[in-house]
Amino acid sequence: MMVSFTARANSNILAYRLLAYSEGDDIIEISHAAENTIPDYVAVKDVDKGDLTQVNMYPLAAWQVIAGSDIKVGDNLTTGKDGTAVPTDDPSVVFGYAVEEAQEGQLVTLIISRSKEISIEVDDIKDAGDTGKRLLKINTPSGARNIIIENEDAKALINGETTNTNKKNLQDLLFSDGNVKAFLQANTTDENKAALQQLMVSNADVLGLLSGAPSSENKVNIRSMIGAGVPYTLPAATTTTIGGVKKGAAVSASTATDVTNAVKDLNSLITVLKNAGIIS
C-alpha cells in the first residue's frame, strides 16, 4: 500500500539518494540519510532546501540508488556519503544487497532486505552466556553432551564408555540404599541379602523360605501356596492300570521235600501276593 505525505527538505536533496525522515515543528522533514544508517526511502527527484515536496512511498522490493563507491553483485549495502549506497561488512546497518555491478557515481539496483547473507558471530550475541556460546559453537552430538552434562560418570554412561569406576560412581549417584548398591556391585553380605529380601518380598512365608530357616507354619503355608497341601495317593493297581501296591507279608523259604508240601508253600505265596495287590 502506498503512503503519501507532504514533506519539507531541510537540505538540498539529490535524485536517487537515500533519504531519512524526521519530525519538524509542523511538518515531516527529509534529508539525505546519514552514513552507516538504514534509510527510510529513496529520492526520485532533486528538491531544494526549504522546498515542499509530495512524497509517495511505494512498497517496492528494489531501489535504484547512486553508488558511493564501486559495488559488486551480492554486496551488502548501507548508506554512504550524501545518501549514496556503499558496501558494508557491518550486519547491523545493512538495508539491502546489490543485484548488479556499479562503479562509483553510477546507478545501482539493489534489493531491499536486511537478511541477505548476514552472518552473526556467536561471540557477538550479548544475551548468551559462556556456556551457551560454547554450545552454539559445537558441531557434534558428543561435544554438546559434554557441555550440557557436567558429571563425568554420566557423560561416560551416555557415550557408552563406562569403566568400573564410572559404574560404581553412577550407582552411588542413583541409589541411596546401601544394600541395593552392594547387590549391583556383586558384593552382598548376609546382612545385605536379608535386607534385600525384606525390601523385595512382602510374604512372610516366602521370606522364611529364602532365609533358609522356615518355621513349621511357613512350610505348611508354602506347600498350600504351591498346591502341595494335600498328599497325593496312588490309585490301586489293576491288570491294566499302573498303581500303588502294598508290601506283601513276610514269607519263609520253603522247606518242602515233596511235591505236596511244595505246592502248599507255593499257594501260600500266591495268597500273600494277592493280598498285597500284586496279582489278581
Swiss-Prot record:
Belongs to the phi29likevirus major capsid fiber protein family. This is Capsid fiber protein. It holds the Pfam family Phage_head_fibr. It comes from Bacillus phage PZA. GO terms for biological process: symbiont entry into host cell; virion attachment to host cell. One of its GO terms (cellular component) is virion component. Protein that forms the 55 capsid fibers. These fibers are not always present and may have been lost in some lab strains. They may enhance the attachment of the virions onto the host cell wall. Keywords: Host-virus interaction, Late protein, Viral attachment to host cell, Virion, Virus entry into host cell. InterPro entries: Phage_B103_Gp8. It is found in: Virion. Its main location: virion. Homotrimer. Forms a super helix coiled coil in the homotrimer.
